[in-house]
């Protein structure tokens, strides 16, 4: 199964040069270097808590700012997930998780439906976490959903520390993605849709 549920994406523009490898049936092993330390930290959360093996290498124009690299990593990772899922046969399809981190609690609910949509409700008071612009969190997820074809709802239940809120978000996201992409043995080789198909981005 693992050999069928992995993919590699290479994406090069005038602004960034990115390669992503993902194994959906992995052990949470990651090698990540984007040039954006806080983004690296969040991507490690996706790998570790989702149990996805993940290799990401990005070179971008971070001397200008982090926006292009942050967005393009989201694009490439979304494409990698979509390619690894293929026709999405046998997957559970839906996932949800509540993740706490100290005072913060974030809920993520998602559907690997082939219908890209983001509802985003994080209230981040700090303009930056370290050197990372907190506006880029939403930009990352916009890029991801548009290229993975998932419906994603992110809801902050409570929290005051921006770092805690964002990290709880990524942890909840990783566990929800793990739940949604895992194989449902009762579905065997069928597509989890009454229509008989799910769009593949």
UniProtKB/Swiss-Prot annotation:
InterPro entries: IGPD_sf (IPR038494), ImidazoleglycerolP_deHydtase (IPR000807), ImidazoleglycerP_deHydtase_CS (IPR020565), Ribosomal_Su5_D2-typ_SF (IPR020568). GO terms for cellular component: cytoplasm. PANTHER family: IMIDAZOLEGLYCEROL-PHOSPHATE DEHYDRATASE, IMIDAZOLEGLYCEROL-PHOSPHATE DEHYDRATASE HIS7. It is found in: Cytoplasm. GO terms for molecular function: imidazoleglycerol-phosphate dehydratase activity. This is Imidazoleglycerol-phosphate dehydratase. GO terms for biological process: L-histidine biosynthetic process. It is an enzyme of class 4 (lyase). Belongs to the imidazoleglycerol-phosphate dehydratase family. The keyword Amino-acid biosynthesis applies. It holds the Pfam family IGPD. It comes from Prochlorococcus marinus subsp. pastoris (strain CCMP1986 / NIES-2087 / MED4).
């Amino acid at each position: 199964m693992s050999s069928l549920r992995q993919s590699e994406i290479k994406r090069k523009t005038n602004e960034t040069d990115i390669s992503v490898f993902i194994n959906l049936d992995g052990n949470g092993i990651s090698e990540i270097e984007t040039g954006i330390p806080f983004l690296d930290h969040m991507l490690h959360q996706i790998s570790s808590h989702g149990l996805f093996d993940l290799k990401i290498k990005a070179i971008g124009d971070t001397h200008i700012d982090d926006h292009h690299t942050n967005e393009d990593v989201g694009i490439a990772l979304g494409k990698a997930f979509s390619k690894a899922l293929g026709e999405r046969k046998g997957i559970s399809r839906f996932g949800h998780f509540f993740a706490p981190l100290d005072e913060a609690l974030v809920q993520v609910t998602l559907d690997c439906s082939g219908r890209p949509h983001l509802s985003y409700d994080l209230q981040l008071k700090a303009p930056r976490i370290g050197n990372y612009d907190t506006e880029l969190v939403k930009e990352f997820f916009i890029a991801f959903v548009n290229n993975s074809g998932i419906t994603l709802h992110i809801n902050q239940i409570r929290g005051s520390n921006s770092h805690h809120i964002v990290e709880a978000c990524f942890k909840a996201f990783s566990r929800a993605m793990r739940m949604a992409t895992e194989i449902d043995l009762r579905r065997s080789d069928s597509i989890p849709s009454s229509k008989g198909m799910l769009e593949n981005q």
